[in-house]
Amino acid sequence: MPRILGIDPGSRITGYGVVEGSGSAPRHVASGCVRLPTGPFPDRLRVLYRALSELLAQHRPEAAVVEQVFVSRNPDSALKLGQARGAAICACVNAGLPVAEYTPGEIKQALVGHGRAGKAQVGYMVRMLLRLDATPAEDAGDALAAALCHLHQADMQARLRRAGA
């Protein structure tokens, strides 16, 4: 039963979500947000790296998924988001995990059926698929959505291998 850590990187808040099982029978393990302190950006990246390293040690996933960067109108924001992604990827690779990356559109397509779904639709599907009592916070929900997308992709790849394709 694969266990996947999904990460929705951010320069102020990074969402995480751990799921296990299969694309057709996923189970919620943990989710939440890493809130980064104010202060020098390199210090915030260190906090993010350490927090994710602790989550990796605690939950022991078999793979990680990091949402890809969207194009921003603000170059400084895009650079900071890219650096946060880098800290997240380094934490995962340092723990020996393979890291998959999906665009927001690919994640929405896997969960909702079309790549232009709204945040509310994605949150609803995360809640339904994982049988949660409430819709998770947006950043944690996005991370869970990324992990669910990867479970779905892993199921599809396994089916193709079994079919000899």
Curated annotation (Swiss-Prot):
Q: What protein name does the entry list?
A: Crossover junction endodeoxyribonuclease RuvC
Indicate which residues the UniProt annotation says bind Mg(2+) 2. Answer: E67
Q: Which family does it belong to?
A: Belongs to the RuvC family.
Q: What does this protein do?
A: The RuvA-RuvB-RuvC complex processes Holliday junction (HJ) DNA during genetic recombination and DNA repair. Endonuclease that resolves HJ intermediates. Cleaves cruciform DNA by making single-stranded nicks across the HJ at symmetrical positions within the homologous arms, yielding a 5'-phosphate and a 3'-hydroxyl group; requires a central core of homology in the junction. The consensus cleavage sequence is 5'-(A/T)TT(C/G)-3'. Cleavage occurs on the 3'-side of the TT dinucleotide at the point of strand exchange.
| Assigned GO CC terms | cytoplasm; Holliday junction resolvase complex
Q: What assembly does the database describe for this protein?
A: Homodimer which binds Holliday junction (HJ) DNA. The HJ becomes 2-fold symmetrical on binding to RuvC with unstacked arms; it has a different conformation from HJ DNA in complex with RuvA. In the full resolvosome a probable DNA-RuvA(4)-RuvB(12)-RuvC(2) complex forms which resolves the HJ.
Q: Which reaction does it catalyse?
A: Endonucleolytic cleavage at a junction such as a reciprocal single-stranded crossover between two homologous DNA duplexes (Holliday junction)
Where, per UniProt, does this protein localize? Cytoplasm
- Can you provide one Gene Ontology molecular function annotated for this UniProt record? crossover junction DNA endonuclease activity
Residues recorded as binding Mg(2+) 1, renumbered to this chain, are D8, D139
The record's active-site residues are D8, E67, D139
Which Pfam families does the UniProt entry name for this protein?
RuvC (PF02075)
This protein's superkingdom?
Bacteria
Q: How is the cofactor bound?
A: Binds 2 Mg(2+) ion per subunit.
For this UniProt record, give its keywords in alphabetical order, as a comma-separated list. Cytoplasm, DNA damage, DNA recombination, DNA repair, DNA-binding, Endonuclease, Hydrolase, Magnesium, Metal-binding, Nuclease
Q: Entry's PANTHER family? A: CROSSOVER JUNCTION ENDODEOXYRIBONUCLEASE RUVC
Gene Ontology biological-process annotations:
DNA recombination; DNA repair
Cross-referenced InterPro entries: RNaseH-like_sf, RNaseH_sf, X-over_junc_endoDNase_RuvC
What this protein needs as a cofactor is:
Mg(2+)
Recorded E.C. number(s)? 3.1.21.10
Report the principal subcellular site. cytoplasm
Designated gene of the protein: ruvC
